[in-house]
Structures are given as structure tokens and as C-alpha cells.
């Protein structure tokens, strides 16, 4: 039987030009991460020769992407100064937007915060009101540098169409229609806008700010909803239909509870902070009247849990067990061995984490004799709130690197 011919254009080799482009991308990424490096440092990190690095940085300087700074430094031999990303770039206003809160900070060309951190509770009832809240936060962010050119990078809770920059569905919001965030904000503010999911923001922050050295990982955000994002082969995995990482909508129970997505028994109905509060109140109503139902929020649940309230303890451990089992089922197909947890449920602490871990690590395919760094680890994320929001600025960096020579 004759071999089938390769599909035209499906397999492309790397000619010398593409190798140079790859190396330029690598150097630019290092400069963004390090905030500045010498030629010798770049050569050491990339394992390229000094002459090869010289050609790369000279080309990047000529293109206006990189600048050379003279630095007073006692050294033997020639010292070519420090190379940094060009200052001829707009600032970036980074935002995280949910139906109840907006957080924002402005960063400079090196992705260093240059404004006050905005953390504002909001109560929009319509998409138009949400747009007004976003614009108000942008104005507050730009108070320190009102005349500086800028661009927007917005992380949105829920499903996002990244191609057109729209919020397709925002759970917990009092509306159901799509919001064309990119179009509306670009038309109103006359700036460039990128929009993505809030879990992607966390994954970008972990990738660029927490030094994972190219490891695959999953970020799991367990808050009033549950979402996730994956870094695979150093790239954020999004999927074709913008639905990747929707672990919160795995069906885990026939509990009769309808999720915000319209289906019954999703993980969010069992393990999110909203679900924990509802389950506690349901159980507490049958036990004793210790809690005022109308004012009960997740912080109240955490206090009860930390004070060894038996109902809160049981509800939290049940949720952790289901969450761990779901993680196992979800991740065993991808064989990702690093899971990083964020969200308000992390306030439940180490016992909650241990229960999740015990369920997640029941993996018959994991080699007990594997290297420590190859074993599965479930841990809390350690980035600060500001660092997480700054993560959205790297959406622009990744776009620049992807389009470096297109």
C-alpha cells in the first residue's frame, strides 16, 4: 500500500531565518522576565555564543524593540552595557473584572506597576453599567500619569471570545447577553484592548512571574465559581471554542441543583465558595438557628470552619473530596503534575488542601520512584493580588513575541 503524501504546508522545517526568529523571541522573553541583561548573561541563559547574541541584540536595537543602557560596573575586559526592552511602548492598564468587583493597576514598558492598586466593589445591573464601572477604574488608575499613552488588558470572569474580545457569558451577572468589551472600549477610549479569561490571567502571572522554567501546570481558581487554565509546552491552552479549563462544569452529582450554566450537579454546585455557604445554611437550618441567613457570606463560613464548627468542617471536607476527585479525573488525561490553587476557598487552609491532595494523588500511573520534581504536587499559589493582576500585561508581551516577524 503506497504511503499517503504529506498534506501541503502541514510540516515545515526550520530554515536559518526561522532559527534566528526563534532566538530573537527567546532573547526578548528573557529581557521581559529579567528587566535587563548583559550580552554575557544572555549568552549564558540561551547557550548561544557572544557573537550570536551580539547579532540578535543589534537587530532588536535597530528595530526599536530593545535599548542599550550604559552601566557603571567594575569589570575586566569590554562591557557592552545592559539591554532592556524599549521604553518606546505604551503603558498597560491591567484589569480583572467580575460582576461584583474590579481590580486594576497600570504598568510601564517593563511590566512594573506604576500606579495605585484599584480594588473596587461594584453592583452593575446592566452591561452599560459595567462599562461605566470599567471606565471609572481606568481613570483612577491613570491619575498618576494622565498624559501617558496606554493600552488595556482585561481579564473577565466567565467565557470569553478572545478573537473579538467579547464576554460571552458572565456567571453571577444579572444579564445573559454577550458584551463586546473590546469594540465598546476601543470606540470610546481610542486605545487598543485585549480581553481574556481571568484564569488565563493567573496562568500568565505564574508563567512570567513565578519562575516555572517551562514546566506544564494547571491553575485552578476556586472562588464563587470554579475555573482553570493550563500551561502546556510553555503556551496557554485555550481550545477552539473558548471553553478550555471549564472544570467547574464537570458533572459530579445528581443533586438537583441547577448550575449557572443551566446544567444540574456541576462541580461549582458542590465545591465553590457559593456552594459551601448554601450547603451550610441548608444543614444549619435543620440543626440550629446560629446564623442569620440573609447576611451570611463566605467569610462567615471560614470563621465557623476555623472555630471547628462541625457542620462547616463536614461541608468543607466533602467539597474538598469532590474537588480532588474531579482534579484526578480531569488531569490524568493530560498528565500534568503541578496544580496551583487560587481563590477565596484557599482561606480554608492546609487541612482542606490535604484532603484535595489525597484524592488527586491516587494515581496508579505515577511512578513512585520518579524524580521529586516529576511527582504530582498540589499547592496554594503564592503570587500577591497585584502580581496576579499584572499577569494580564503579559498578554501584550505574548502577542508581541508571536508577531515578532509576521
Positions of predicted regions on the chain:
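Short glycine-rich anion-binding loops that position phosphate/pyrophosphate groups of nucleotides
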Residues: 157-160, 223-225, 345
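ATP-binding/phosphotransfer module of carbohydrate and carboxylate kinases, centering on a glycine-rich
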Residues: 1-71, 75-118, 122-148, 267-406
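Glycine/GP-enriched mid-protein hinge/lid loop-to-helix segment characteristic of carbohydrate kinases
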Residues: 5-6, 116, 126, 176-177, ...
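Glycine-rich phosphate-binding loop and adjoining helix at the ATP-binding site
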Residues: 114-216, 351-362
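Short, acidic Gly/Pro/Ser/Thr-rich loop/turn segments
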Residues: 100-102, 159-161, 227
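Short, acidic, Ser/Thr-enriched surface-loop or helix-capping motifs
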Residues: 108, 162, 231-232
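A short, compositionally biased micro-patch
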Residues: 86-88, 97, 155, 223, ...
